[in-house]
Amino acid sequence: MSKFPTVSEILSGKVAVGEEVAVRGWVRTRRDSKAGLSFLAVYDGSCFDPLQSIINNDLANYNDEVLRLTAGCSVIVTGKVVESPAEGQAVELHATHVEVVGWVEDPDTYPMAAKRHSIEYLREVAHLRPRTNLIGAVARVRHCLAQAIHRFFNEQGFYWVATPLITASDTEGAGEMFRVSTLDLESLPRTDEGKVDFSQDFFGKESFLTVSGQLNGETYACALSKVYTFGPTFRAENSNTTRHLAEFWMVEPEFAFATLADNAKLAEDMLKYVFKAVLEERKDDMQFFAKHIDKDVITRLENFIASPFAQVDYTDAIEILLKSGKEFEFPVSWGIDLSSEHERFLAEEYFKSPVVVKNYPKDIKAFYMRLNDDGKTVAAMDVLAPGIGEIIGGSQREERLDVLDTRMVEMGLNPEDYWWYRDLRKYGTVPHSGFGLGFERLIVYVTGLQNIREVIPFPRAPRNANF
C-alpha cells in the first residue's frame, strides 16, 4: 500500500490496522476536547466520509497551527491507523505529525464555511461547490455512471468514436444551433444580396456547434457495425428551466443490421447495467441522496432493474391517455408530441414500470427516422421512466435513399447539404438503429436532484456562462 493511501482505501479496510500512513486532504471540521485532544475530520474526495484524525496537544505545532485549522485548510496528517471506538467508523488515525499545506485566508468570509448552504447559493460559487458533501457525491456518481457506460458498450462489442463538435449539419433540423465564426463582427463581409458572406469565414462555410454526434456516428456504424459516441453537445434553446442546459453530454450508440426492437433491448440492457453499477459501487453516496434528497431514489432504481420494460405503440398510448379520465394541462390528441405529464402518467400510473413508446407520427419526428409501411408513422421510440418521463429517444434509421430524400424535402432540408450522409444509402446500405441518452438527465434520475444544473460541474444556460 502506498505511503499516501486515500481516505477511501483506509476506511474500506485496504490499509491494515497498525500501519503508518500519511493522509493528504482538506479539513472538514475541527473539534477540541478539554482533555487536550483535537479531532480533525479530513476528506480528500475519494469517498463520502471523512477520516477522523486524533491529534494530541503534545505535537510541536499544536498550539500555533493545529488549533488555528478551519474548514477548507489543506493538510498532510501522518500517523497510525487504529481501530475506532466511535460509532459509525471502523478506523481512525492517531496523528504523530500534522503539516499545514494551505490556510484559508479569512475563515469568516470563506464561502464554504462548515454550515448548510442552499443549492441556489452553491451555484453562485460553482468553483468551490465540489467541496460540499452534495456536489462531491454528485461528481463521484457522475464518474461511476460514465465508467459503467463505457464498460457496458465495450462488453457488448461497441467501439467508441469521437465525433466532431464543429459541424455544418443540423441533425435535428430544429435550427437551434450555436454559430462558430471568426469573422470580425464590427465589419462583416457581405454577399451581393447583403447577406453575411460565410465563404470568407474560417471554414469557408457557415459552421455550428453540434447538437448531436448521431449522423457522424452512423458513418462508422456502417463500417465497424457497432459504435457509440459520448461527448458534449450544444443547443441554443432559450429554455431557462430545471430540465434544460445549453451544453450537455450525450451517449449515442449506433449499430448496423439492427431493428427498432434491437434498439429497445439495447436501451433496456444499458440502463439496467449502469443502475446496478452505481448501486454497487457508490453505496455511501447513494445513501446520502436517499437520506437528504429523495428517500425513494434507491428503491426506484432497484425496481427499475427488476422490471421488464412495457412496450406500447404511440397510437395505443394516445388511446390510454384519452380514456384515463384525467384532465391534463396539455390536451391529448393523435399527432401531439407527448408532454412530461403524459409520459409520467404512462410510466407511473398506467404501466407502473419503464415503458417504450414506439411508432410516432412522422410529422413530429426527425427526417432520418425510418418511415413505417403505413406512411404516417416512423420507427421511433422513447423510453419513459417512472419519476422523470423520457430518458432515452431513438429510432431505426431510414436506410432507403429515395425515402430519405423525400423526407428531407418535406422538412425543408436540402439533400445536397447531406451528400455524405446520403452516400451511406448508396454504397451497401443496411438497416441500422440508435438512440440518444442525455447524460445529465440520467444523473438527475439517479440522484433524485430536481435541477439539472446541479449535476454538471459548470452549467451553461441562457445568460449564464460563468466560470
Curated annotation (Swiss-Prot):
Q: Which residues cross the membrane?
A: none
What GO CC annotations are associated with the protein? cytoplasm
**Organism domain of life:** Bacteria
Ranges in coiled-coil conformation: none
Keywords assigned by UniProt, alphabetized: Aminoacyl-tRNA synthetase, ATP-binding, Cytoplasm, Ligase, Nucleotide-binding, Protein biosynthesis
Is this entry keyworded Nucleus? Answer: no
Protein name per Swiss-Prot or TrEMBL: Asparagine--tRNA ligase
Tell me what gene encodes this.
asnS
